[in-house]
Amino acid sequence: MAQKKIRIRLKAYEHRILDQSAEKIVETAKRTGAEIAGPIPLPTERTLYTILRSPHKHKDSREQFEMRTHKRLIDIVNPTDKTVDALRKLELPSGVAIEIKL
């Protein structure tokens, strides 16, 4: 018997918003009777940008900026029709990117 599975990947720059969104998704799926695996924390992507402080000279004086992308993975096993409808109607904060695979 083949199992249906929905895989949801969440990405955000702020981990608090990301965790709140993951909790909303888990709570909604549990309320509609689906099995949940997660939220699983994935490795944080760290991007470092190095720029010169001065516009013309002083090459040794530099400044570094960092951007961290936090990620979570949620698997919903054997979702019901109610689960899919509830997830479509769910509103999440604007700072969270969602990728859904069926």
Curated annotation (Swiss-Prot):
GO terms for cellular component: ribonucleoprotein complex; ribosome. It comes from the Bacteria. SUPFAM superfamilies: Ribosomal protein S10. This is Small ribosomal subunit protein uS10. PANTHER family: 30S RIBOSOMAL PROTEIN S10 FAMILY MEMBER (PTHR11700). Disulfide bonds: none annotated. Involved in the binding of tRNA to the ribosomes. Gene3D superfamilies: Ribosomal protein S10 domain (3.30.70.600). Keywords: Ribonucleoprotein, Ribosomal protein. Belongs to the universal ribosomal protein uS10 family. Part of the 30S ribosomal subunit. One of its GO terms (molecular function) is structural constituent of ribosome. NCBIfam families: PRK00596.1, rpsJ_bact. Pfam families: Ribosomal_S10. GO terms for biological process: translation. The lineage of its organism: Bacteria, Bacillati, Bacillota, Bacilli, Lactobacillales.
